[in-house]
Amino acid sequence: MAAPMELFCWSGGWGLPSVDLDSLAVLTYARFTGAPLKVHKITNPWRSPSGTLPALRTSQGEVISVPHKIITHLRKEKYNADYDLSARQGADTLAFMSLLEEKLLPVLIHTFWVDAKNYVEVTRKWYAEAMPFPLNFFLPGRMQRQYMERLQLLCGEHRPEEEEELEKELYQEARECLTLLSQRLGAQKFFFGDAPASLDAFVFSYLALLQQAKLPSGKLQAHLRGLHNLCAYCTHILSLYFPWEGAEVPRPRQTPASSETEEEPYRRRNQILSVLAGLAAMAGYALLSGIVSIQRAPPARAPSTRALGMAEEDEEE
């Protein structure tokens, strides 16, 4: 019997099954098609077989870590949400996917990873609370830098004095994109009628993050909430396909050890690497900042038997 397909993705929060755009899109597509996946919702990307999220381990043991390639593999396995689409609808899917990436993705990155208030009070807060120590000290900042580099690739190089004008232009285009999506959806349940397609999985992942997150700076969020059919569309998909998921982020300290072992066979190795990386980072910071200094000391006496016993007990704990 073939091993089950396994999906590793970011865990849920804000009332969503995942707080990550790509993870949410893949999860939603899998629900639409009924693909039999063993889902591991985690908050440590090092526990993924690829080191990134989302990632799919196929029945043959191959690891796929690009969302579009994951969906392509599910289609090859006969889980195809676009099977009944016409050629015209297939072309519309490609056009709207391109529109999402060009007009909505840059503003979504800016909203969650560049806007200072949103990043500090919402994005970094969630990841810092969700991630295990010591990853929560440095990984959110690294992720922010990666998203800022991605935004630069999407928008191109700009001088600092042009940034304010560029931001206005990006948000205006994103508002127009949302309005166009609202007009295209109309009163339908999904973009191509009564059954969801791959386009719905991606549109939902973009809109649901904007709708559900409690953003202190929500310029685009306010526009979305004025488009009532898009809001109802998100609520409908959440209630129909994710009725019991996404309420709270799991706390690393409260996760049962057996559950972690069940989810990821590399847990012990990654824990050791995480601790070593964190200790090295903290030691380096302490030395560079002068908190700790290295001085010569006279030879110390050998510790008593009692002291050795206490040290061993501390290590075992």
From Swiss-Prot:
TM region(s), chain numbering: 164-184
UniProt keyword annotations, A-Z: Isopeptide bond, Membrane, Mitochondrion, Mitochondrion outer membrane, Protein transport, Transmembrane, Transmembrane helix, Transport, Ubl conjugation
PTM field: Ubiquitinated by PRKN during mitophagy, leading to its degradation and enhancement of mitophagy. Deubiquitinated by USP30.
Covalent cross-link Glycyl lysine isopeptide (Lys-Gly) (interchain with G-Cter in ubiquitin), where: K38, K41, K78
Record's subcellular location: Mitochondrion outer membrane
GO terms under biological process: mitochondrion organization; protein transport
Cellular-component GO terms for this entry: cytoplasm; SAM complex
Principal location class: mitochondrion
Signal peptide: none
Cross-referenced InterPro entries: Glutathione-S-Trfase_C_sf, Glutathione_S-Trfase, Metaxin1/3, Metaxin_GST, Mito_Protein_Transport_Metaxin, Sam37/metaxin_N
Function: Involved in transport of proteins into the mitochondrion. Essential for embryonic development.
Family: Belongs to the metaxin family.
Subunit-structure text: Interacts with MTX2/metaxin-2. Associates with the mitochondrial contact site and cristae organizing system (MICOS) complex, composed of at least MICOS10/MIC10, CHCHD3/MIC19, CHCHD6/MIC25, APOOL/MIC27, IMMT/MIC60, APOO/MIC23/MIC26 and QIL1/MIC13. This complex was also known under the names MINOS or MitOS complex. The MICOS complex associates with mitochondrial outer membrane proteins SAMM50, MTX1 and MTX2 (together described as components of the mitochondrial outer membrane sorting assembly machinery (SAM) complex) and DNAJC11, mitochondrial inner membrane protein TMEM11 and with HSPA9.
Protein name per its UniProtKB record: Metaxin-1
Gene behind the chain: MTX1
